[in-house]
């Protein structure tokens, strides 16, 4: 009996030891490899990049997409740590493993700083690299210290220097649209980066990462030889996880997730795709999954909004207000690359910020017209973004509690009980304090658009064109198509009459689903639905 107990303990222990360790929050290549954590092999990209024609490269990707890990991987590679790359693609590609001195600068801690703080921080991170190579320097200007550091390391080692700069734009993101602060901080960063051009004879490779694209003139006015690979097809999969990598390098993880959720492998893959896939970083990019959400999903054995929850996009919501972006306009749009792959500090529309931050992505490309189709990447982004926007239309805590009402509405609509769903919404809105922007019909249209969009799994559109006019809201579910017309301070019968008089239903006659017409009337004094009428076509 004792032997059985010991045997059982050993089995349990082996199972615990065999549990895969995910690199959640770990950005150090050395640590991931020595601790036997999961590493998705990106070393073929490392070899390709470091043996390309350009020695100065910039890569832009959204936050938590693996940029810092890529920088750390480059550092280990250039420092000749061959043992860390055992079993990876680069082990067979690289023959020489030449060791180079590496200067690694992370700007991640340079956020939310005033001018003097930023200058001190730059001197601090330069000092860390000086200490690494036993160099002393008391110059007070960061650009002078950087130039001296590069030249002294070159002389001391007899080898060209590698410079890796992670999150180059971190000090500027929060002030990107504050003209006074941006100008001061931008000048500091421009001066800091300026030695990179004059030090070219001493440099083997320079690599910079960031989220946003600042104009060449504003930051790198002296450095005009940077190659931007952010939209290069060859490097579209350098960060994030491709579908091929998911199905091959994480195949066991998919099976474990499916088993945990009581579903098939195929269903698990579809759920992963719907929630975390959908990113494309070039015209011919393969599907890219969000790595942070994917790892968390496998680690927790459950689907969640991990990436969105890891960083509230306050600055993004503020910029949407500044540019008067309506929720219904977020989604499918057509644009030339100059409209989204563009510097953000002087943007006249919010598209570049949405794209570069990961809230919009490339969905299609027409080679003849060079026209891109952009859209929200996946369910996680759609739900997270609209939940963040809901407080603009509902007050404080009531917006936060709205998710329960919305979930209940979703159940009722699936059961073909739109009347019950609208009753539930009316009751909920009755608990929301009066909002002083409720005297415009468009306010209610946007509010309903957000709420219907959060039902998930349904297609929602506003201002849909028909031969006789525009429909306020169209909601397409698995079993019905709803035509919804809104009125303010009038009556639901008037709204329904407009649907019938203008024969809106004819526009959707070939949709293959029963059509339901709904007239809804809001009362601006109550900020709530006053009445509605539902009629089958």
Tell where the protein language model's regions lie, with residue ranges.
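Domain-level recognition of nuclease-like catalytic cores that cleave nucleotide substrates
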Residues: 507, 511-537
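Structural motif
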Residues: 162, 480-482, 516
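Conserved catalytic cores of phosphodiester-cleaving nucleases, focusing on short active-site segments
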Residues: 448, 471-488, 502
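Active-site metal-binding core of divalent-cation-utilizing nuclease and nuclease-like domains
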Residues: 153-157, 451-478
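Metal-dependent nuclease catalytic cores in nucleic-acid-processing enzymes
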Residues: 192-199, 352-360, 449-453, 498-518
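Mg2+/Mn2+-dependent nuclease catalytic core
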Residues: 182-188, 488-505
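Phosphate-binding site recognition
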Residues: 2-440, 455-456
């Amino acid at each position: 009996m004792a032997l059985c107990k010991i045997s059982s303990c050993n089995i349990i222990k082996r199972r615990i030891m065999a549990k895969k360790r995910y690199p959640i929050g770990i950005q150090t290549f050395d640590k991931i490899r020595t601790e036997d954590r999961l590493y998705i092999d990106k070393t073929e990209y490392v070899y390709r990049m470091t043996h390309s024609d350009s020695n100065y490269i910039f890569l832009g990707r959204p936050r938590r997409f693996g940029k810092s890990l890529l920088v750390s991987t480059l550092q280990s590679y250039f420092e000749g740590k061959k043992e860390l790359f055992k079993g990876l693609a680069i082990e067979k590609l690289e023959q020489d493993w030449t060791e180079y001195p590496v200067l690694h600068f992370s700007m991640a801690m340079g956020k939310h700083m005033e001018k003097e703080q930023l200058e001190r921080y730059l001197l601090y991170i330069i000092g860390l690299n000086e200490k690494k190579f036993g160099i002393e320097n008391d110059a007070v200007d960061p650009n002078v210290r950087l130039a001296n550091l590069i030249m002294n390391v070159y002389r001391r080692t007899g080898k060209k220097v590698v410079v890796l700069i992670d999150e180059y734009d971190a000090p500027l993101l929060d002030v990107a649209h504050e003209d006074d602060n941006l100008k001061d901080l931008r000048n500091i960063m421009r001066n800091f980066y300026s030695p990179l051009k004059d030090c070219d004879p001493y440099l083997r490779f320079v690599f910079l990462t960031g989220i946003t694209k600042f104009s060449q003139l504003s930051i790198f006015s002296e450095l005009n030889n940077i190659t931007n690979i952010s939209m290069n097809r060859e490097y579209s999969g350098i960060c994030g996880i491709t579908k091929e990598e998911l199905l091959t390098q994480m195949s066991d993880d998919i099976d474990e997730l499916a088993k945990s959720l009581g579903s098939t492998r195929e269903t698990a893959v579809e759920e992963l795709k719907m929630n975390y896939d959908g990113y494309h970083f070039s015209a011919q990019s393969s599907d890219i999954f969000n790595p942070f959400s994917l790892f968390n999903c496998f680690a927790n054995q459950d689907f969640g909004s991990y990436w969105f929850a890891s960083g509230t996009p306050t600055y993004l919501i503020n910029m949407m207000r500044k540019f008067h972006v309506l929720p219904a306009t977020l989604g499918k749009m057509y644009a030339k690359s100059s409209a989204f792959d563009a510097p953000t500090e002087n943007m006249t529309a919010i598209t570049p910020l949405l794209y570069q931050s990961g809230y919009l992505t490339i969905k299609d490309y027409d080679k003849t017209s060079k026209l891109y189709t952009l859209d929200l990447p996946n369910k996680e982004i759609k739900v997270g973004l609209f939940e963040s926007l809901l407080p603009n239309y509902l007050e404080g805590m009531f917006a936060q509690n709205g998710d329960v009402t919305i979930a209940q509405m979703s159940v009722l609509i699936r059961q073909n009980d739109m009347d019950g769903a609208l009753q539930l919404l009316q009751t909920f809105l009755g608990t929301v304090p009066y909002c002083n922007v409720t005297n415009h019909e468009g306010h209610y249209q946007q509010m309903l658009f957000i709420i219907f969009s959060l039902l998930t799994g349904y297609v929602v559109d506003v201002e849909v064109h028909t031969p006789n006019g525009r429909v306020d809201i169209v909601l397409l579910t698995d079993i019905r198509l709803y035509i919804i017309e809104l009125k303010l301070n009038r009556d639901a019968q008037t709204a329904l009459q407009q649907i019938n008089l203008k024969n809106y239903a004819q526009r959707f006659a070939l949709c293959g689903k029963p059509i339901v017409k709904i007239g809804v009337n809001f009362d601006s004094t109550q900020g709530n639905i006053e009445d509605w009428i539902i009629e089958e076509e």
